[in-house]
């Protein structure tokens, strides 16, 4: 049993890397936030499906908050600046934005795939967890639980370690 859990965790770590690189780094960050290139619909759809597993909540919220971050990097208005919301809330990704100004998300609401995920992320997350657990608790560990933990802590580490100096590095979106 311990070997099965260990293998599930190892597979979950590898799966987390796929989600992190394809879904978060390429799709959310470079494609949506910075509009650096175009991707085919299949690439976008698979990437969004991966992100729903990692519980980033709504992709529109993630993208808009990241755009806010770039406009106000490490200063007032940055939704995940340690100086504004506290080290532990940033580290464990428990910060919250009361209201995101529409200027950061207006273009995103033109994308039906993003809008679908925005409206249904909670139901998708519950379904992913229930179905994967019913398949097997080990499958759930690898497919859903480990990526969830890695996403929460990974984004938190990126935002605490990557912005520990005054001003941080900022590239306009």
Tell what function each PLM region has:
Residues 1-157:
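Non-catalytic, topology-defining segments of multipass membrane proteins
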Residues 111, 165-173:
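Active-site-proximal inter-transmembrane loops
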Residues 160-161:
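Hydrophobic alpha-helical segments that either span membranes
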């Amino acid at each position: 049993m311990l070997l099965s859990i260990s293998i599930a965790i190892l597979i979950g770590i590898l799966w987390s890397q796929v989600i992190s690189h394809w879904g978060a780094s390429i799709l959310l960050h470079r494609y949506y936030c910075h509009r650096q290139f175009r991707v085919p619909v299949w690439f976008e759809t698979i990437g969004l499906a991966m992100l729903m597993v990692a519980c980033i909540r709504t992709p529109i919220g993630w993208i808009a908050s990241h755009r806010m971050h770039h406009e106000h990097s490490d200063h007032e208005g940055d939704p995940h600046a340690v100086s504004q919301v506290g080290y532990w809330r940033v580290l464990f990704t428990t910060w919250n934005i009361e209201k995101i100004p529409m200027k950061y998300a207006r273009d995103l609401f033109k994308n039906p795939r993003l809008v679908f995920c925005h409206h249904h992320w909670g139901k998708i997350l519950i379904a992913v967890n229930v179905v994967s657990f019913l398949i097997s608790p080990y499958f759930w560990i690898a497919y859903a639980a480990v990526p969830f933990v890695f996403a929460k802590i990974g984004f938190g580490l990126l935002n605490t370690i990557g912005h520990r100096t005054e001003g941080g590095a900022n590239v306009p979106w």
